[in-house]
């Protein structure tokens, strides 16, 4: 081609790379989030996982962290359960590593499988939210203050998550969580349903199939749950009525009732005068250096932690999630994270919901729109006790009835639930609402009873293993066996395996298409530049043609770009989808090539260790509880 032609080609190539560089840096695919190995993992094949940050607010560097586990088996259809812990400001890695996830820590370095984990027939998506919680990060000046802000932030996250993982978007979608997630989940559900009604969403056929909500020991209705503290501790014998201390607690309860006795409930999600009731109860139980555990009244804890040091797994989780190899495996942005903490006091101090109504006011509308909701309670939890939840249900009106009325004055019966021959709890249901009371369980029901909680989940999701295989669990309601469920690992039937294979093959092409959109732009720009160059070359060197550039590009004499593209398309499609063959990973470009640049800055944090006391004092109030567990302590 000659020196001038070579120089021209080099110039055009430089221009193309300059134009396409921003796209190649910022675009991410599923491959960037794939967890290749997990430190301390048990023997056996690694579960299919993705983890990392998704930017939801570039202007504030707001990023939410997620950890996704693909279901081990598919029953009759694909389902995704999104799990949120509460706080506000407490990490959903509590749920991942202590409750419903497939792994639990034996010690600071070793993981073990959990029998009864929720990923048997459902994909699990754990999200640290809102911004500032757990591994999530962003400008501290832009932490959310209201519940509708939180819900909007989360919908943005889901939009972006489904762009990267489009093969999960058609799944039946469920939101689950506990404690302050009783505020999060109804607000998020409302935002999702409103989103689905928008014309542009319907036109693009991107409606999310929201199928149900599960809330455990939820903080949902302060109007019913604050006043329930006294009846609960009297009923459980924690406080003796008529004593001087009991009279003091009753005086605080009376003061709280004045705060609650208002027509406009805006701003009543968190009431300091009402929080004093719980603190007075804990003070009453203070004996020596011990006090009752507010999350499990059968236990005690150091005063004034009173449950903040529980569960015992906590002492292993923080060191594990701060290990450099774990941080790397989960694709944590090392420039931003300053060490995982269970609860971020700054998030709780910011999210006071002073202009938000309690989530209980959203429940009737959600139920009337046909959305099934399951509320479950651990019998021995004090902070979000079952007496308050039951009182809330009793007084809630929806679909032409009050509480669990089947008809005027006729209530749905409380049905006895037995699991593997032992009394497990009570079921009660009517008009899309189900309530489950777990006997002898704490604030974190799945921590105590993972297999029973999985049985509850499978019943709610409608999983029936009759045509799948496996040993059924002996679970009965009023002595009757319902759909056959299983809470142990088992093989799928051939038919189910074929359905899963077909789903994953489809997923591969969808993910390839999504991640290839940016590549298409790059190819189009390069093709345009190529065309201009060829046109100019033909004019200048019409006699010699342009074959001489082939060796430079590694092409054959046909000038076909398609052969290189075809050679790599299948392999790239596989790794960018969720369907991974780990033997293919050795053939992929280096991690340095796949890595993405990250912003630098000192104004962002992920709940620095030791910052909680400062966070708690930021609004001028002395926090009731140790900020390491969140101001309300409702994790």
From Swiss-Prot:
Region named Disordered: 472-497, 583-635
BP GO annotations: apoptotic process; proteolysis
Lumenal side: 28-514
Cytoplasmic topology ranges: 536-635
Glycan-carrying positions: 112, 432, 440, 492
Subcellular location: Golgi apparatus, trans-Golgi network membrane
Membrane-spanning parts: 515-535
Pfam families reported for this sequence: Peptidase_S10 (PF00450)
EC category name: hydrolase
Disulfide bonds: none
Keywords: Apoptosis, Carboxypeptidase, Glycoprotein, Golgi apparatus, Hydrolase, Membrane, Protease, Signal, Transmembrane, Transmembrane helix
Segment forming the signal sequence: 1-27
GO molecular function, one term: serine-type carboxypeptidase activity
Name of the protein: Pheromone-processing carboxypeptidase KEX1
């Amino acid at each position: 081609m000659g020196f001038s032609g070579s120089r021209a080609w080099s110039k055009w190539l430089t221009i193309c790379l300059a134009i396409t560089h921003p796209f190649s840096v910022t675009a991410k695919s599923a491959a960037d989030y794939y967890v290749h190995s997990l430190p301390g993992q048990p023997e056996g094949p690694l579960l299919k996982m993705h983890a990392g940050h998704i930017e939801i607010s570039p202007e504030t560097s707001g990023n939410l962290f997620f950890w996704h586990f693909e279901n081990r088996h598919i029953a009759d259809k694909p389902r995704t359960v999104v799990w949120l812990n509460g706080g506000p400001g407490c990490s959903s890695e509590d749920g991942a590593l202590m409750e419903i996830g497939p792994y639990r820590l034996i010690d600071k370095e070793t993981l073990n499988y959990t029998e009864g984990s929720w990923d048997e027939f459902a994909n699990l998506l754990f999200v640290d939210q809102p911004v500032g919680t757990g591994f999530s990060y962003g400008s501290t000046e832009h932490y959310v203050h209201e519940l509708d802000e939180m819900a909007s932030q989360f919908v943005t996250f889901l939009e972006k998550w489904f762009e990267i993982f489009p093969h999960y978007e058609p799944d039946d979608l469920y939101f689950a969580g506990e404690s302050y997630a009783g505020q999060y989940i109804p607000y998020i559900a409302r935002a999702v349903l409103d989103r689905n009604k928008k014309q542009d969403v319907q036109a693009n056929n991107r409606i999310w199939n929201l199928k149900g909500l599960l809330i455990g020991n939820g903080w949902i209705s302060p109007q019913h749950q604050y006043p329930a503290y006294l009846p609960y501790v009297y009923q459980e014998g924690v406080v003796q009525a008529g004593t001087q201390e009991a009279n003091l607690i009753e005086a605080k309860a009376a003061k709280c009732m004045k705060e609650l006795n208002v027509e406009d409930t805006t701003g009543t999600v968190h009431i300091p005068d009402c929080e004093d009731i719980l603190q007075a109860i804990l003070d009453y139980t203070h004996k020596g250096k011990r006090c009752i555990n507010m999350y499990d009244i059968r236990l005690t804890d150091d005063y004034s932690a009173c449950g903040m040091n529980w569960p015992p797994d906590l002492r292993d989780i923080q060191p594990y999630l701060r290990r450099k190899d774990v941080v790397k495996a989960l694709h944590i942005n090392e420039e931003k994270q300053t060490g995982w903490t269970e609860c971020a006091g700054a998030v709780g101090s910011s999210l006071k919901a002073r202009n938000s109504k309690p989530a209980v006011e959203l429940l009737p509308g959600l139920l009337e729109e046909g959305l099934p909701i399951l509320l479950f309670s651990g019998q021995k939890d004090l902070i979000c006790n079952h007496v308050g939840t039951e009182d809330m249900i009793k007084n809630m009106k929806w679909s032409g009835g009050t509480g669990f009325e089947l008809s005027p004055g006729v209530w749905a019966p409380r049905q006895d639930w037995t699991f593997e021959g032992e009394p497990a709890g009570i079921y009660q249901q009517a008009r899309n609402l189900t309530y489950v009371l777990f006997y002898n369980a704490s604030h974190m029901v799945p921590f105590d009873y993972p297999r029973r909680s999985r049985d509850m989940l499978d019943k709610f999701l409608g999983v029936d293993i009759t045509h799948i295989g496996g040993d059924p669990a002996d679970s009965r309601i009023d002595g009757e066996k319902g759909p056959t469920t299983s809470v142990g690992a088992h093989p799928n039937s051939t038919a189910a395996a074929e359905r899963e294979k077909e789903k994953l093959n489809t997923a591969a092409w969808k993910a390839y298409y999504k991640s290839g959109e940016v590549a298409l732009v790059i190819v189009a720009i390069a093709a345009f530049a190529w065309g201009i160059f060829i046109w100019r070359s033909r004019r200048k060197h019409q006699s010699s043609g342009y074959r001489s550039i082939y060796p430079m590009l590694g092409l054959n004499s046909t000038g076909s770009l398609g052969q290189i593209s075809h050679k790599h398309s299948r392999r790239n499609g596989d790794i960018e989808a969720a369907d991974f063959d780990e033997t293919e990973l050795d053939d992929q470009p280096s991690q340095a090539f796949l890595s993405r640049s990250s912003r630098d800055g000192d104004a962002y944090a992920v709940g620095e260790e030791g910052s909680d006391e400062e966070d708690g004092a930021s609004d001028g109030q002395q926090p009731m509880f140790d900020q390491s567990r969140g101001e309300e302590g409702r994790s």
